[in-house]
């Protein structure tokens, strides 16, 4: 079995698949949509990430029962910290996603949230200076330049500094239609809920799948208005948000998203099923 982890991203090895060097070739994890290659037999997904559009995919879709991706957790002891709001007396939203995922629709939505929540702030983590300047200009035009804060990119060997940034955040905001994945796992491990928006394809449903499997599906918005309303609601209902954070602290490690043992079993079964399927077609 050959597994593609890059798809059409830069520095990919997609040409290897053209030669059909393995009887079973699948796409998983790194590139969540079809690459268009007929030599890719399967895309590994789940029931939440690929729905009615499945018929438009070239490869077969294999749906793992719970979630297409699981995380082993992070090598840092989990602690429960009170909401930053209680110390700051202002509400802090955060999004540490790659700036490539931050489009005009996302910015407009975040701006509306900040305008509806008095004395609130938004922390973004920047690695692209040009994007940072564009975003600053947009917020300045909206009279919100003092409501945005940028954290600089941390070094790869200094993950703890990055991880501790979540201690400054009351509620995380996901990007759309290209959702975060690693950042959502990080936030939930740190007991910080994430507002996401359900989308129309695999990449735009990653947040939906993670939050459903984390048992906080009520943080999944159906549209932009719902996204805004949910963010504003929790900013104005601190006790409700704190209840969710406490629940995450107590339960998140037991959920499907961090159940690597259960996921490994499902993953191995998936690979075996794919081999059987390909062998059947060769007979």
PLM features per residue range, with description:
Residues 4-5, 45-46, 96, 125, ...:
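Generic beta-strand/beta-sheet core signal
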Residues 1-12, 16-37, 158-206:
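A donor-sugar binding/catalytic signature common to diverse glycosyltransferases
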Residues 19-79, 83:
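Active-site-proximal region of nucleotide-activated glycan assembly enzymes
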Residues 66-157, 161, 165-167:
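Conserved catalytic-core segment of nucleotide-activated headgroup transferases in glycan assembly
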Residues 5, 109-116, 138, 142, ...:
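Generic, well-ordered alpha-helical scaffold segments in large soluble proteins
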């Amino acid at each position: 079995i050959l597994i593609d982890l890059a798809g059409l991203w830069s520095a990919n090895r997609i040409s290897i698949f053209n030669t059909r060097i393995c009887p079973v070739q699948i796409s998983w994890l790194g590139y969540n949509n079809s690459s268009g290659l007929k030599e890719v037999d399967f895309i590994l997904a789940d029931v939440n990430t690929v729905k009615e559009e499945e018929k438009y995919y070239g490869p077969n879709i294999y749906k793992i029962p719970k979630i297409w991706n699981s995380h082993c957790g992070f090598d840092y002891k989990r602690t429960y910290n009170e909401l930053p709001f209680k110390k700051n007396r202002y509400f802090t939203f955060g999004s540490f996603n790659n700036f490539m995922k931050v489009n005009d629709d996302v910015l407009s939505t975040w701006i509306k949230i900040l305008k509806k929540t008095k004395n609130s702030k938004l922390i973004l983590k920047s690695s692209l200076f040009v994007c940072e300047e564009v975003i600053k200009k947009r917020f300045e035009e909206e009279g919100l330049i003092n409501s945005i804060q940028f954290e600089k990119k941390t070094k790869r060997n200094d993950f703890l500094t990055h991880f501790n940034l979540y201690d400054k955040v009351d509620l995380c905001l996901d990007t759309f239609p290209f959702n975060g994945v690693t950042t959502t796992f990080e936030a939930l491990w740190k007991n910080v809920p994430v507002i996401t928006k359900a989308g129309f394809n695999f990449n735009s449903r990653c947040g939906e799948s993670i939050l459903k499997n984390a048992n906080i599906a009520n943080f999944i918005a159906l549209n932009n208005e719902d996204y805004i309303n949910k963010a504003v609601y929790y900013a104005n209902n601190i006790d409700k948000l704190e209840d969710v954070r406490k629940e995450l602290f107590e339960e998140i490690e037991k959920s499907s998203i961090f159940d690597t043992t259960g996921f490994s079993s499902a993953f191995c079964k998936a690979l075996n099923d794919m081999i059987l399927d390909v062998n059947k077609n060769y007979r």
